[in-house]
């Protein structure tokens, strides 16, 4: 899993950079910088930082939905590989 996607998802889940940073075992400034870098790359903010708790922007909502779909695909691939490994070792 891409670390940046996990970081952004954790901020979304916690609605707080500080809480997300604690959960991810990284500093809050480091997390904020990483999220800002992604926002700069896509050209739009993902979070409305003027609200408390944090809220997603419209682009952020689309981003999170896509991230959730990617997480599901990653899980299916991981399950498939685990099943192959189990079949291979069971032969």
Give names to the regions the model predicted.
Residues 83-91:
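Interdomain hinge and pocket-entrance segments immediately C-terminal to HTH DNA-binding domains
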Residues 9-27:
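Short helix-boundary/capping micro-motifs
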Residues 1-5, 28, 60:
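The N-cap/first-turn positions of alpha helices
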Residues 18, 36-43, 75:
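Residue-level detection of the helix-turn-helix DNA-binding "recognition helix"
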Residues 39-56:
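A short LG(V/I)-centered, amphipathic sequence patch enriched
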Residues 59-73, 84:
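Short, solvent-exposed amphipathic helices
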Residues 23-24, 35, 42, 63:
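Core residues of bacterial helix-turn-helix
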């Amino acid at each position: 899993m891409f670390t940046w996607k996990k970081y952004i998802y954790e901020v979304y889940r916690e609605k707080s950079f500080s809480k997300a940073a604690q959960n991810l075992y990284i500093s809050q400034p480091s997390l904020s910088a990483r999220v800002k870098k992604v926002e700069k790359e896509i050209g739009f903010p993902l979070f409305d930082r003027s609200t408390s708790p944090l809220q997603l922007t419209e682009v952020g909502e689309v981003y999170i939905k896509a991230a959730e779909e990617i997480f599901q695909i990653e899980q299916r691939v991981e399950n498939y590989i685990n099943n192959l490994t189990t079949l291979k070792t069971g032969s």
